[in-house]
């Protein structure tokens, strides 16, 4: 059973035990649907440098009887939009999008390097910052008030400029308590996008 996975900055290709393709752009799912494939999984996709994968091409794949899954990033966005038509969403990010808890495409967007160097992310997704702050508050690393203030600060920069380092600097400038920022800086940050993709 052939499975094609569109993945880039969320997971390294060697972590995926199926046929790997670059992040999905317009036309990629349509081309894949013309192959002898039974399953297509969309994790990563393009937002800006090229047109995003179209809803219609996913619908064409579904009409051909190909199971189409989505998780973590562009896949979660498209799965939340196309679940009524049979696309299968996976993971906490998909659930948050499908329930309307998250509503913006830029929640999952990251800047990344080209494929020749493995699509390594060079910014942090807002959803990962949000999940990390929520987890830190649950563990008592920061207070709920600090969590809320930092989430608001995390939303302000353009997605290419979002990072934990930027968020901590913005928090210092905004007067967030320094002890909490120091504790947060030392705390291991979860990667919800990668967790959903796995």
Predicted regions and their residues:
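General beta-strand structural signal in soluble alpha/beta enzymes
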Residues: 21-22, 41-42, 68-72
